[in-house]
């Protein structure tokens, strides 16, 4: 590989400390579900302040800075109103998704990283496995992560069908109503149908960008 083949993205030059009391990932869902439109957090974009029905589309692996540096590839997303907020630490998928849906920091909900020391083993929190065995019976997801997602409400979740019933799904999405998709093109159709049926809040999750970033980095494939 030549130096000219390397794509350098602009990133924050120093670590950012999460501000859990202000404009942070943990405040999104409580702000959407607990407040009336006129009572939502002031850092919410105005369209979200006024919205009576909300679809929260989580694009894993697409941060604000990545979106800015790839703006030409996402003109519709760039046309939407918004700004950067802080995430949690560590900002790995398992911890961040759990913080998003519970409104709690990793220290509070217990999913503190991609791998966790469980005393008798080191557990991959997305797979709920050690190097040798399934840990679902040894460490039940609902006892590892005890905070109810979506402030205790039963919310429709539009995500990959194969994620339904997994231990990590039980840990961070239990009590929700799964609406699985097999092709990403189904996400919009399913969300539209749910809103048309009267749902006030829909949670949708797409992991394709994150997978590409892990496998190929932030270059031409991203």
Q: Model regions: which residues?
A:
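Short acidic, Gly/Ser-rich segments with clustered Asp/Glu that frequently serve as metal-coordination loops
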Residues: 61-65
